[in-house]
């Protein structure tokens, strides 16, 4: 099981982001007023997105809330899993796109929403859909929207501190007054590299939370193999029926169960999701540990049909 390691990794990544903030803050002169201003800016710029995350994400996807009569299977699964977790049932939405995907959003359990695309409902069977919904519910129960908001706020602070170092130099510390702070080259490196480093750490936190949702969701459903099979189908479906790239879909892509926009090579470092094959391998290992028997990973030949 990787849960405790993932939690430690998330904590260490946040600590690293804070260390970067402290380093750049020190380089800018260590003014508490400056740091306070940028922290407030970071909180303000992310608060709205966090507080209204459910409304913004749903609107971005053009999704609509559905009744139990319209989506009885989803309601049955979500009601069962919510009751099992001892949590209130979220609202259910369906997005009008044939690209298979799903996401959960909301600042807490009482303001949560789960959204499935029309495409995912067509390619997954009930067992696989249950695995996906378990994953999404755990994003809500693990407060991953809040985690993402904090990471985003810290990245914003780092960016502003970098720009401050670029435009205002190293402040008034005696040991830097005579040398012009870190110098132009140091300032340029800071303004360029600091936001990149912050973004890399932010994406690493996101990938860690995906692994946690995979594991915790599988513990909730008791069926990691179902989620592995679902991810396999979703990955294939995203290639054959790609999601249209718009400002709305891009803003929600980090919340989705699988990255709808392919990331290859160096760009994987900036991906919000771990590689699908690695997620599947972990899930199959988890299934093996739970069942006590080796289970072969799903192959591409299993991606069609229900």
Curated annotation (Swiss-Prot):
Task: Provide the topology term for how it sits in the membrane.
Answer: Multi-pass membrane protein
Which BP terms from GO are recorded? proteolysis
The positions annotated for binding Zn(2+) are: 135, 139, 210
Cite the entry's keywords alphabetically.
Answer: Cell membrane, Hydrolase, Membrane, Metal-binding, Metalloprotease, Protease, Transmembrane, Transmembrane helix, Zinc
One Pfam entry name: Peptidase_M48
Give the similarity note.
Belongs to the peptidase M48B family.
Quote the protein name from its UniProt record. Answer: Protease HtpX homolog
Q: Which organism is it from?
A: Bifidobacterium longum (strain NCC 2705)
Tell me the name of the encoding gene.
htpX
